[in-house]
Amino acid sequence: MHYLCSKQKSMRRFLPALLLLVMGLGACKTPEKPEPGMTVFRYNESKGIATLDPAYAKSQTLIWPVHQLFNGLVQMDSALNVQPSVARRWEISDDGRVYTFHLRDDVYFHDSRVFPGGEGRRVTAGDFVYSMERIMDPATASPGAWIFNNLDTTRGPKAVNDTTLKIYLKKRFPAFLGLLTMKYCSVVPREAVEYYGDEFGHHPVGTGPFHFKMWREGEKLIFRKNTDYFERDAGGNRLPYLDAVAISFITDKQSEFLEFIKGNLDFLSGLSPANKDELLTRSGQLNPKYKGEIKLYTQPYLNTEYLGFLVDTSLEKVQNSPVTNRKVRKAINYGFDRKKMMKYLRNNIGTPANHGFLPKGLPAFSPDSVGGYRYNPDRARQLLREAGYPNGEGLQEITLTTTDDYRDLCEFIQHQLSEVGIDIAIEISTGATFRDMVANSRLLFFRGSWIADYPDSENYLALFYSRNFSPGGPNYTHFSNPRYDSLYETALNTMDPARRQNLYRQMDQMIIDHAPIVPLYYDQVVRFTHTHVKNLGSNPMNLLVLKHVKKKHHDTDSR
């Protein structure tokens, strides 16, 4: 592993420092105020940020800031294609088990006191070996350790030389490149992790378009432009364009909205019941009063919202539950109007899930191949009769557990199901408690979301593979079907994309037919920016990409 910087990089830094000395300025002193004319992108994170260590970047709250600071071997473009990042190219062996990555030689870690002279060094293949082994180390306790479960660690990962990395798999996995786009797979310097220890997440050192500047917890987090960032635009200009990123931590959503309207925030993400009708028309268009001031971005989001049934009859609590009856589960699927729900509760942001579990935006999504459920109260009543509950007589009340964010959706479903003879009780739980109860099979009927970890249908269909039962895996319904498992395993070993998509669609249809879930809607990314913000755009993973963003006017909020 080499720790020396290139002459070109050293000289580029030496000249500005010399100029500052000539001007009589303290080169090492941080100015109290930023230079005039700085462009700062400002957004709010209402849930707070616990760490900036990519090893723990599990939620969108953490992924967004981590994405500005770190890079991996590969990255995803806005069309979900895997593109080079630190790796400039790669090869995959014929058997699909050996990946060889050829790295750029112009990628440097951010300047930090952990390096000799405080100057960031060049990234090597050995840094990726260290970063991957750190994620796999049980002592790290990274929630992303599962990514590398299929690695043949007897052979690698292996740094062949400074710019060549080999990764060996136990068995082929066609979605592996997509996995490597996850922020868990970011490269980190051993020196910084060892120097800061458990505090590395509060003193991050990465390679990204921005570097860490300052963090006042609960108040403000500042990133500054990485002037040595390796990526350039189509015209050869070095990215990023912005000078800084400022993240605030306003917890109240209405206050956040007001700050955005006043121009103190550049970006607002998602819908809040408190302001959706102010920003959007019922049809999902921008409120005309904001025309010329605010831009609305929407596109399919790889997120399926659903209700899940615990169908594992080996569990005593499930054995006497009416949801073990497939006809009851299907009646629930037919018993409410998804289209009406989306219009009145989501302002048509999102698409009614009238097909399978796979969302719009994935290649395997096929409304022509996978038939789902549409509102049909007569069919729901018929299924109840066939299940032995005519008009719902004798059917015990079913408890649906959710968090408060989805109370309105669940109450809508509750009301409509009552009209076909199905009585639903709604139980509201807090986020952490709710997730724990779902993972540990304590809820018979629950609301769920599945946001893609990586853009491959396998990531969704793994939720119904019998070897993935929670709490060890993501199969929260404990659905089990030998035929489904066989299709899933065949898909994992199929390199041909067209054949694999066909297998995925067969599995998706099986889930609809067996009904361990109630698909609600396929979500949409919804973003609001002021018109002076350019090039933000959106993507199906709802990743916040700021390296291309430009602002027309200037800010001074980057201290």
Predicted features by range, described:
Residues 44-94, 133, 140, 205:
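N-terminal lobe/hinge region of extracytoplasmic solute-binding protein
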Residues 91, 127, 140-190, 211, ...:
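Surface-exposed binding/hinge segments that line
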Residues 88-140, 166, 256-259, 321-323, ...:
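Aromatic- and charge-enriched surface segment that lines or borders ligand/interaction sites
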Residues 224-230, 299-327, 344, 479-480:
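A bilobed periplasmic-binding-protein/Venus flytrap-type ligand-binding module shared by bacterial periplasmic
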Residues 174, 216-221, 294-305, 331-367, ...:
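Detector for C-terminal structural segments
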Residues 47-63, 86-87, 113-119, 175-185, ...:
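A structural "hinge/loop" feature
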Residues 110, 168-186, 201-255, 281-304, ...:
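Aromatic-rich, solvent-exposed beta-strand/loop patch
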Residues 210, 319, 326, 351-386, ...:
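Structural transition elements
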